[in-house]
């Protein structure tokens, strides 16, 4: 390699280092508390306990690899809490890099949190794409746990929620989508319910910190920012069948005494209004065998993608899918919420009216058809 090329590489490397360094100059990390995640819990009578995960770069006096720390404050309003974070840390609290907002169970089950949502959606620096969820137990405890890979809890949860739709076949939400749902005719929306599952692993730097992983298999339903009910795993799977861009769902069936796993890799959902004030809904899902694709291992475990699927397996998947979808529809009718936007669909046709706004979800008859085909 010529000296000129070597010099060019050195200059490029120096430029990259300078660019990265400039993005973390004193006005950022040193002068501001960069918040990665926000947890909200109930505090006293109508108060709010706020727990934030803030960036904490390691230095000579800290443990090697320290990435973030949590700060907990209490106040009567969310704006006072944010001010208290600034006073506690001695730095301006910055929400520009916040990736997740978590509502604790005692808070979201008992409080109309409209003011909280309005504060965050109108905050000039918080991104509308910020993930929003709720959790089992307190948000403070959740943020003080350790993820399976010992990374930031906020980043771990936000990353999982961004990947849920494509990889784990569960609908997810962000701040903008949730806020819009609460301003539609039926004011119905949902939040993913995060649960921490402890493991026997220990943090090498903090032996007292509980390590584990997070699950997202349940949802909490809200109307007008007030809690309605939870959806269990079966009902969540049923709801996801109605969402066209949610794929990856797996079904297990038996063939010749062997378990066979079929995975949904394509879906078409057609929802039409009917003359009797209801809906005809047709869900067509395409499936294929779900197997490990390990062609790089000399073909020993390579996926046989051309295997034909026995029609009996397709029938079994259809029955399972119908059971899941029916369970969700029954829950929606029982608790009178509308995640399938039945009210909004008829509002677009008939216009807004008090009669439509107060129409029970159970009064929309649904004719459901599910088709399963091999991809």
Annotate each language-model stretch with its function.
Residues 2-375:
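Membrane-proximal alpha-helical signals and transmembrane carboxylates
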């Amino acid at each position: 390699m010529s000296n000129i090329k070597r010099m060019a590489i050195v200059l490029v490397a120096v430029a990259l280092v300078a660019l990265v360094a400039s993005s973390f100059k004193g006005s950022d990390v040193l002068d501001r508390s960069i918040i990665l995640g926000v947890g909200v819990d109930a505090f006293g009578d109508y108060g709010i306990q706020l727990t934030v995960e803030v960036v904490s770069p390691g230095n000579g006096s800290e443990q090697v690899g320290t990435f973030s720390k949590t700060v907990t404050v209490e106040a009567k309003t969310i704006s006072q809490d944010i001010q208290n974070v600034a006073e506690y840390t001695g730095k301006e609290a910055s929400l520009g890099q916040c990736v997740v907002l978590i509502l604790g169970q005692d808070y979201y089950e008992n409080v109309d949190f409209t003011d909280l949502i309005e504060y965050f959606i109108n905050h000039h620096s918080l991104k509308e794409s910020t993930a929003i969820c709720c959790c089992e137990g307190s948000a403070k405890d959740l943020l003080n746990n350790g993820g399976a890979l010992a990374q930031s809890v906020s980043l771990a949860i936000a990353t999982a929620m961004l990947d849920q739709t494509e990889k784990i076949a569960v609908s997810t939400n962000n701040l903008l989508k949730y806020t819009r749902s609460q301003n539609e005719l039926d004011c119905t929306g949902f939040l993913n319910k995060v649960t921490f599952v402890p493991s026997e692993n220990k943090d090498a730097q903090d032996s007292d910190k509980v390590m584990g992983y997070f699950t997202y298999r349940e949802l909490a339903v809200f109307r007008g920012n007030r809690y309605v009910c939870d959806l269990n795993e079966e009902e969540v799977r049923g709801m996801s069948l109605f969402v066209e861009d949610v794929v990856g769902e797996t079904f297990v069936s038996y063939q010749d005494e062997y378990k066979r796993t079929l995975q949904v890799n394509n879906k078409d959902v057609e929802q039409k209004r009917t003359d009797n004030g209801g809906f005809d809904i047709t869900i067509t899902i395409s499936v294929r065998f779900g197997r490990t694709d390990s062609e790089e291992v000399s073909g020993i475990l390579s996926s046989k993608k051309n295997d034909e699927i026995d029609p009996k397996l397709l029938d079994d998947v259809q029955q399972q899918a119908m059971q899941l979808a029916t369970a969700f529809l029954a829950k929606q009718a029982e608790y009178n919420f509308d995640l399938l936007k039945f009210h909004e669909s008829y509002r677009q046709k008939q216009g807004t009216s008090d009669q439509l706004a107060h129409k029970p979800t159970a009064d929309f008859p649904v004719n459901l058809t599910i088709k399963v085909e091999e991809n």
